[in-house]
């Protein structure tokens, strides 16, 4: 069995999850940060992180961390942590391709006594049913005899400077009791607030996938309530503030549900449920409702424009924000694109402005070229879609100055007071 003294870690995948983890471990023990994209490796070697999760100063502090896109550099590692994406495909089914590819790569350098820990969000059973067989097949080694595994789900919240990897409690697990204890010890090297050792890998997998599923369902409920209250002419935020005076009322808000976690992970759980003969109803209903919010937003906007006698066809709308959440450059699975596409269906021209987002990435992912400068008096409607600090600082007067003399200001994020906008969710 490995010892902490002999530990040499490889972190596979240096994105929003992998890099902060690699940096923290790199302050304590030897670490190789591995990514298949040489451009990412070059960027990190130059001391920069375009995701903005880790500062140049923090990168410098990780004195034992090196970066590589070459598998050969992983041969000396004995503790592998997999932090690759687990997306869904066009049919909203789990796409384990990145996980299988990562497992294949690790299998090529796996040795007797090594431990492989997965952090990527999956359905219960995926580690042992999909990943382990790949490791066995490629390496020729036998699971739980020659090598071992663990699962420790990531809980990174992109853009959150308060909840960082070191101060978020970590779930750990292992394929044997001894390995579970060792995995737990390894993570305790960097997790300052402690760990929770789950009773099995499947329990740890299930815990992760329901964290985001629970949040998704709760937001769906509030979204449905917002639709109901809008029909009744009641301000949803006023209702939620009043209800929030009760100590056990959960403080969710309506909105678009995007990103790489909340809008994706429930499909992993529903896929597994359906494979064992159970059709989940509440989870899928919540997904349908949340996925329909972009269209709902545009419908409400068009109605407001008509009431104000603003010509809809040929109108020009400014969408403030493209990233899936505030103060973050991440545009993966952003639902702002649903608003843009729906506006296009009405022959409305949509400009998107987001100072956080890389323009080349926006063009590559969505075919959108964000505007660089904001011009006053240009728009028939302004949609405040993401609550970036820059937009909050502008205030209602500056936001309205972007509109024509007759325009709609739609506040999706409750940034402004009710009286300062024409519409809000």
Predicted feature locations:
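Structural/interface elements that position substrates and couple domains in central-metabolism enzymes
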Residues: 1-425
